[in-house]
Amino acid sequence: MTIKWVVSDPLVMNGEPFCYGTRLTVRNILELRSSGYTLSRMLKDHPELRRMGVAAAYEYAGRNRDRYADFFDSDGSLAGPGYSDAEADGLPTQYRIPGIVIKPSP
């Protein structure tokens, strides 16, 4: 079975895209990241989240920049801490996006 990690349903969450198995929208996850939440803190505070779901939310935001423009820095990366290289190990290639999922190198 393949899980669609980001789901959009007009009858759920007013149609706002959300992470499968949670009541957290992509916007909620981006708000957490931009306020300084790391992946480990998100997973600790929201045990219903999954590593893959958070990465999919970031990737979804990257594909829908116009909808989530407030969360992008001037260099085009998502604001806030992303995945470290170690946290990104094991993610599928489509989610290993520098600046979007993986925090940019200084």
For every predicted segment, state its role.
Residues 3-18:
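Short, Lys/Arg-enriched N-terminal segment that forms or immediately precedes the first helix
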Residues 24-106:
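Long, charge-rich, low-complexity alpha-helical segments
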Residues 21:
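Anion-recognition interface
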